[in-house]
Amino acid sequence: MRLAMISEHASPLAALGGEDSGGQNVYVAELARRLATMGHRLDVFTRRDSTLLPTVVPFERGVRVVNLPAGPAESVPKDELFPFIAEFRDAFYQFAREVPTAYDLVHANFWMSGWVACEAKRDLGLPFAQTFHALGEIKKREQGAADTSPPERQAAEVRILEEADRVLATCPAEVEELLDLYGADPARLTLVPCGVDVRKFRPVDQSKAHKKLGIPDGPTVVYVGRLVPRKGVDTLIEAFALLPDHLDARLVIVGGEPGVEVSPEVDRLSNLAEKLKVREKVTFTGSQPQKELRLYYGAADVAVTVPHYEPFGMTPLEAMACATPVVGSRVGGIKTSVADGETGYLVPPKDPEALAGRLLRLLSDGALRDRMSRAARRRIKEHYTWEHVAHLATAAFSEVAAGAPRISKTA
């Protein structure tokens, strides 16, 4: 198949770890790679955010990244991009009409990309599949007045659900949300999870990881992810402070803005650790390159991800692929990916006491950690490889393409 993948704010070329970069960037890059290895050809359309970017950038064999104009060629927070989305649409139309071989369908990622896909279905006759990655109703419910989504988001998501030929939900929780909050047509929903590269994220000798990273020996808890309030890192620090002193545990927090050593969130979290008298046991590493993350997961006795809410959650997959047990919030995709009592534990969000209890259990029982480590790696290889995800996505895309009338690319 010839696929047009739209990801307006999350380029596969982007650095990870910033406020608006993370799981979607990984998803788009890895899914595109695996689809290409299956013989599909893809153009990934994203917004040009630098004057140095050419229009077309070869990414992998069979994959090109197409940088389209949409507002200033600089970084813009994703919630401020909608005023430029019509410009993005028009540039997409021009490119799509000029490609030698017409696209079979569009795969839209995030709601603004879905808006473009709705327009392209109407004007170019292109069928489309949608992956939301996050839902506006959930964000509004969880963030309240702090939600910075533009007012057009809700109507756009409703339109997308009415017009999409297929919606790829990443977890059962998202299926429930689409049905209950949006009245989605269940016949057009397909469960396609996110994945992880099990060659990149694989077990590593813990003592070697400690030595290479300069982490002192002893029980180690690791957090990897963005440093924004909804990720619940404050809950983790509060829980860590409840652990008994005799454990002599260390907390390593990996994440932050690329190239930025200090930020308001790091200051807030550091001050909290100081207030709770554990600052000397907490290390903030700042943003780290993807290739280094395996070492941090490998150094951990347990990885923690306890967001207030999370549409899916990629870091639990990465940790489990590295054979590291995970304690995660019972929210979103985490409550499915982490098998409670088997590959780690699930706890309520914003509950430091519950989290501390599970951390103490894992840090105090090496046999339990070993058992969960083996189960974690096994679960990932059975259910969450990118190859598995690509096969599920291809099946959905093929059904969409087979049911679509053939439309001239010049329509």
Model-derived segments and spans:
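N-terminal subdomain of nucleotide-sugar transferases
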Residues: M1-V65
